[in-house]
Amino acid sequence: MDNSMMDSTLRRILFFSNEFPSDDLKDLFRRLDQHSKDRRFRLLSIFLEESTAILKDEVSKLPRPLKELVPPFNSVLSLVDVDFRQGPLGAAMESSMLTILELGLFIGHYESEDTEWDLVPGQSVLAGLSIGILAAAAVALSSSLADVAKTGAEAVRVSFRLGVYVADISTKLEAPQSDGTLSSWAHVVTEMTEASVQDELKQFNTGTHSPELTKVFVSAADKTSVSVSGPPSRIKAAFQHSPVLRYSKSLPLPVYDGLCHASHLYTRSDIDSIINSSESVILPDRSVRLALLSSQTGKPFVAKTASDLFLEIGTELLTGTIYLDNVTAGIVQHLQPQSKETSSCQIDSFRTSLVLRGIHSAVEAELSRDRQLTRRDLVSWISRDFGPRRPRSQASSKLAIVGMACRLPGGANDLDLFWKLLEEGRDTLTTVPPDRFDLNTHYDPTGKTENATQTPYGNFIDRPGFFDAGFFNMSPREAEQTDPMQRLALVTAYEALEMAGVVPGRTPSTHPSRIGTFYGQASDDWRELNASQNISTYAVPGGERSFGNGRINYFFKFSGPSFNLDTACSSGLAAVQAACSALWAGEVDTAIAGGLNVITDPDNYCGLGNAHFLSKTGQCKVWDKDADGYCRADGIGSVVIKRLEDAEADNDNILAVVLGASTNHSAEAISITHPHAGAQKANYRQVLNQAGVNPIDVSYIELHGTGTQAGDAVESESVSDIFAPVTPRRRPDQRLYLGAVKSNIGHGEAAAGIASLLKALLVYQKNLIPMHIGIKSEINPTIPKDLERRNVGLAMQNTPWPRPAGKKRLAVVNSFGAHGGNTTLLLEDAPERVKIQGTEDRITHSILLSAKSKTSLQANMESLLSYLDQHPETSLADLAYTTSSRRMHHNMRFGTLVSSISGLQKMLRSQLDNPNFASEIRPVPNEAPSVILAFTGQGAYYHGMGSELFAEFPYFRAQVQQLDRLAQRLGFPSVVPPWRRFWSLLGVSISAVIGHSLGEYAALAVAGVISAADAIYLVGRRAQLVEERCAQASHSMLSVRASEDAIQEMLAVELETASITYEVSCCNTNQDTVIGGPKGEINDIRRALEAKSIKCTILDVPYAFHTAQMNPILDDLETLAKAVPFKAPSIPVISPLLATVIYDVKSLDANYLRRATRETVDFAAAIEAAQDMGLVDSKTIWIDVGPHPICAGLVRSMIPSASAIPSCRRNEDSIATISKGLVTLYLAGLTPSWVEFFKPREREYSLLYLPKYRWNETDYWIPYIGTWTLDKAHLKHGTKPKTPFSGSMSRPSALRTSLVHQITAETVEATTATLHTISDMQHPDFLEAIHGHTMNKCGVATSSIWSDMAFTVGEYLYRRLVPNTKDVHMNLTDVEVLHAQVASKTKGSVQPLVLRAHLDLSTNSMSLAWFNADGETGECAAESFATATIRFEDPEAWRKDWARLAHLVRGRIEVLEQRATEGKASRLSKPLAYALFKNVVDYADRYRGMDSVVLDELEAMAEVTLVPERYGTWHTPPHWIDSVSHLAGLVMNGSDASNTRDYFFVTPGCDSFRLLKKLEPGARYRSYVRMFPLPEDPNMHSGDVYILQGEEIVGMVGMIRFRRVPRLLMDRFFSPPTTTSVAVPVPPLTGATMKCKDITQTAPALPTPAPPIVVSSPVVSSTMACNIPEPAPLLATSSKSSTPKESPIVTPAESERAEPVDNSMTSQCLRLMARETGLEVEALTADASFVQLGVDSLMSLVLSEKFRAELGVEIKSSLFLECPTIGEMTAWIEEYC
């Protein structure tokens, strides 16, 4: 308001009292603080911030004893709770707070009225008493309200300094009471004059010889009363001394902090020390603007500057006496009429008081009767409702929770199930499920078993391992290794975002760069237990906590902050608080927060139990007298939070509003794990102060409530003291309800806080507080006894919690950490939303559903149908809005346009009832198809086209109006609607343009060749030229349903006779031509063609365009066009004139437009050219831009499979037309901007809570196997008693592996070396290797064990003689195993064996012999049980030999594959192959390397993958050797060609075993073998096992032999030894055994029972057992050659030949990728992207290394980025590999 407009007749007094208003001070300050956060109270906020800063500054300068009295504060509101009338700083706090309150109310009053400064010098005068006069001074120095915000802060500084100084001086006069009792320094005496009181005081002071400084004096006086001041004891003595005063009417005043108005006490130096030490940079040069009346004289202070004014005021406050009568007189004098115009008087004040009422009465009595005196209260505004708060800054915003999701115990996998659980009062307690750990072994209630849990109870979520890996672009292997907490964090984050309707990038607040994640997690069970059993590539990204949040950010492409927090049990709610802080700090605009806990590790159970956290009796018994600890629980929860104003702007549903959030620490607790009531109460106060909320207004608290004695007692105390204090007491209608979700679902630890928050949010939604079920017997006696009197208590039954009309409910959520952290959240109701009722006139609505798998899409459709069946009243408009604009869309899509809910239900049912529906679903392409705009030419326009769009879409309307204004300024009447810009607004990216005839101008404008204004100008002038130069109706145009050549042929006779002439105007399609010419001749042509049954149509146009009729306008048109600038097209232009695609400006000029006007529009040739140049294909989408889809029909005629979309259609609602087009684009793979489509009327739509996404889940769970968490406790105990044998094993050894334990003798000479070693088969590593191969339920040493020992010793001795050897290549030959070595089952026994070796470099060979030894004495047996020879050879010779055989072996493999395809051979899966093996031998998992087998009688091949783990220290791990070689054993013991019912086959050895290169962990190989009976022994079979890597033979087991043994001998030969002594060996039946003392002697060995066996230099496989002596008639002598024999490769007959299997490099690569990712090869389709398959950067590195190592293909990991799909990768491989 301008000053000139103010009421010049109003006389005003502003009175600043020295008393606080009678209102609740805390409430006044809270409301001030609340209003200061609203942008409407900007200056109030500035004033409070400046005042806070000044008080902080002043406190920092105090002496330490005083400084320590002031608690830390961030707002003056924090000081309100301090009892500032007590202590040394009472005067300072009271003075400064009164100044702040009065000036804050003053500023707020003006801002609330939104009025300008109206205090005019001369008309407005200020008055005040005592400290109030300092607040008045701030106004006196101001010329605007903004000035008051700054000068007021300085007044606060002076007030504080004055109070500190006065208190300091006064305590030197009389010390405070030691018991803290407050004594008054002033009394008021009534019905006595000042003079009489002075006389009495003079007598007292003189008579008692009081020092001058401590005398009692008069500090204030008026007609009716006198104030007497002095030290409290002296005042008391004065009243006792004087009979007059003793019997006078007197009262103590609330002045407890010292003396003011004492001229005998203070001097100018005192005043200077207060005023002149002020460090203000604002006030010194400021002038006094308004008169301020002295409280002593009643006249205005004479000061002209700020410094002088404060000096005068300071002098008066410290030394002057207050005379209220003078103040009244001064006020009357000001209010008396100064002129005839003055008609009204006003006193502004802060409520009223006894003094003010006296002044008011006196003024009224003195004023003339024609003066009207009014009062204005400057406090009343503070209680007004100003509507929704408009935050002044992000820091003052309220926050909105807009989405939530959960996985909680008791099957609560969604919010509805969670609420049902709560409403029914269910307890989810159960015992630990077997998939977590085995209670039979890990539970011991006595506590005697180390590392065992003493409680079997918990609360667990359902199916924790189930996860949709494909949806989140994770491979099965990565998913399995990823912590279920992290997986479910992803899932619940998606579901919460879905509920919130968040589409990243839809609005500014949901831009991916402004979204952050905050999750609490306090354990690492999966990483430490389950995944650690087999650490793999994804151990770190799958298990480390930081990756949980990081994976969410990475998947959704959020680039905001990602925090994983651990605050123990409060982690979940602390993460929410951190998210809130980030929102208030402006670091994010949307936050996803939650808590995570999935229990698997018994160690944590044990640790928590031993620390007495856990209940041994069951569930959390919150507030029960028998509470004995908490019960553990799983839990996953996520919430989505925004600032309230953003949520409202985004049209979100708001679940509840966060007013405040805070976390502190119980630093003063008696122990780190003990709760502390003081810290909890301080945190409550912080949250309440932050929000400006009265704790009495809180009506529901969700307790932390663990059910521990200490926790329940402390929390009940803190809650009741703050929220239900003894005084002020809650009214009967202010019941405070309490609840604790842990009594239902247990303590979710890191997820506990988020579970509590989710419950609170549901309480808001359901308006019901669920029953508390934690008290099983009676309430805990440690709970305060007076809770009911305080009107607070648990909701023991389901209790309605209705929202009061026009008000909001307040709730608090607590979560405390065992480490001492306390987190509290304060919530209120969401704003009541009034949905704008629009006129819903859209005829049809687009309903969209999508998924990432066919299964999920079908399930989503079923869910929607079920929802609609249950909610038939659903608004179709809201459903369309929700499914399109408020959903993230995926590659499997369903879309339709419907006009009713019933129609949609019918559509969904018809689709779901189609048995082929799922198979017909196709994902949209990874690359969206190109979109081409086709602009229609003349003849299609009609009245009202696009009118619905014009009416509804502001952008469309604005563009039309802009173009229309351009056209009018150019002198033309109308324009084509701005379709291109509108389609772009809807998110459609244009790839190219084409224009038909006149449409070329629009196409050129869209391509940026000419401007829109130039296009309008040229089209308009062209039309004018046509009208001016061409005769109307003299010519016509004829559309002919035939090609140009066909027309010419049919009209050949007429043309030859020259009876007719025509020109081709347009070649629209190959069968659609438009001709033009003179009207009569065109009519003749029409008749001639119709006579030949050719369809013809005369076009409704007045001219024959693109014919000679246009010649008169061409020169002028070209001249006009030359004035127009032509630019290079921004997108390709498909030219119907040139029948080509134009990419540059060379062909586009004025002449082009001339030719386009005259020459043929060859639309068909242009389309064909675009196809030839690759710009157009069958997937290209065409958008017809024009009033009616003419070009669309032409395109479909040329490309029948093309999608052509109209922008407008005659006689059809234009919004419906656009909707259809958008759905078509959506289903083709584009993602239209549904946001823009719904934006004009978004407020009319509501986001629906539809069923959540239906996941296509698979169980990725790694069970904890065994008892190793228990076993590790025994590592600290002593070892077993030593035997002589075990003692020798404990000595240091130069050679020690898993199988070779100790060197007992070693001799090394120039060319020979001898070595004796000893090993214990009962050693854990050795025993585990033996038990990997069991026969007859006994662990039997496979020959792969002897192979590894041989290679280990061989390489060791060879390097002793030839130390600089790079690689040692060994051929293990003449392996003979005479006796099976069966592991003893006697616990604690030793089972020694001795290996003796002798190497001779002259023969390049080494002989080996294995002996049993006595377990007690270590004495070696007389004869060996196995022998072998190692020959050190050149591997290149092997390579050459095998190269000649490789093609034959590969050929046989291909034949087997083909026969399997034809059903002539058996293809066995891994499970089936090893099931067949169980006829004889049962392999452990690590030995099961064969992935698949093709078996054809005695011939077989196998695909083999070695496990990546070595599981010990080996030369070549036995389980690898067996995996590549035991195919031979499967042939003999699993083929139909063998009599496996009566016999089993074991291998006594082989002629040779050698490997070209070492076997590699995780590598893939192929094995091939063909066994054949030996002619000399019908009970023996032999064959060669070839080992291939890729196309190359890399190893061979030569002449491996198998002997047939009757099954009835199984028990005889494969039973464990009963003692540790060596049994008497069976005498050899053939050859001789090696004597123990003659280790250089070699001898052949007898066959040994065991399925296939192989020996290996770097690797061996197969089942090598021991020789079984058979009955004499069955035995035959076998002589062995020193060189291995290779069995011949048998070439099949032609009839047996088959087509080779696909073993190309591409196929090998695909198989490798499938193996490494855990996917099926069939899933690796050409259009599958590596991102979708879960091939991330880490997997890329693994795959590139595997390609190199296994296939010899050098591929950089970056290739997976350069070739993002399988198809592109395979194309690269075929090209370059």
UniProtKB/Swiss-Prot annotation:
Residues covered by region (N-terminal hotdog fold): 1301-1437
Keywords: Acyltransferase, Multifunctional enzyme, Phosphopantetheine, Phosphoprotein, Transferase
Pathway where this protein functions: Secondary metabolite biosynthesis
Region span, Product template (PT) domain: 1297-1616
N-terminal acylcarrier protein transacylase domain (SAT): region residues: 27-261
Residue ranges annotated for the Carrier domain, each copy included: 1700-1777
UniProt-listed Enzyme Commission number(s): 2.3.1.-
GO molecular function, one term: phosphopantetheine binding
Cross-referenced Pfam families: Acyl_transf_1, CurL-like_PKS_C, ketoacyl-synt, Ketoacyl-synt_C, PP-binding, SAT
Residue intervals of the PKS/mFAS DH domain: 1301-1611
Active site per database record: 569 (for beta-ketoacyl synthase activity), 704 (for beta-ketoacyl synthase activity), 747 (for beta-ketoacyl synthase activity), 1333 (proton acceptor), 1522 (proton donor)
Residues where O-(pantetheine 4'-phosphoryl)serine is found: 1737
Region (Malonyl-CoA:ACP transacylase (MAT) domain): 934-1212
Protein name per Swiss-Prot or TrEMBL: Non-reducing polyketide synthase nscA
Protein species of origin: Trichophyton equinum (strain ATCC MYA-4606 / CBS 127.97) (Horse ringworm fungus)
Lineage summary: Eukaryota, Fungi, Dikarya, Ascomycota, Pezizomycotina
